[in-house]
A protein has these predicted regions:
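C-terminal and inter-domain tail/linker signature
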Residues: 1-137
């Protein structure tokens, strides 16, 4: 996975290096919420808040092999949240600049995802502007 934005994203997320992770994102990058299809988080400032909360809640996180080529990539991740297993099938869309322009997480199983939603919701609720902008679509 070495040498591209997705590999760098995965490496930074495992280390909880949010600034390093943000370096892999385009300035106008967006993340489509897997918990609420209506919410789309945009821009590095809002993504810093969101991704800090996301990777701060996960334990023993690891990514497996990267699939895809060109501007579409797919990586499977797994770890724990609140002591429960959580898996992610993350789809990344890259721009012509090689940076990540869109992130689409797909989480399972249900119980781990539910606990994750509760933990993440409590952390993100401290930032109502981030929530408001994500809901505006």
């Amino acid at each position: 996975m070495a040498g591209d934005a997705v590999a760098a994203y995965c490496d930074a997320s495992v280390r909880r290096d949010i600034d390093g992770l943000l370096d892999t994102l385009a300035p106008d990058a967006e993340l489509v919420s897997p918990l609420s299809g209506r919410m789309v988080f945009r821009g590095r400032a809002d993504l810093k808040v969101l991704l800090g909360a996301v990777y701060g809640a996960l334990r023993d996180w690891q990514w497996e092999q990267q699939f895809g080529e060109g501007d579409m990539r797919f990586v499977v991740g797994r770890g724990r949240v609140g002591g429960l297993p959580l898996d992610d099938a993350m789809v990344f869309e890259l721009g012509p600049d090689g940076l990540i322009h869109k992130v689409r997480p797909h989480l399972r199983p249900w119980l781990g995802t539910s606990v994750f939603a509760l933990l993440l919701g409590a952390k993100i609720a401290r930032h109502p502007g981030v929530i408001w902008r994500a809901l505006r679509g």
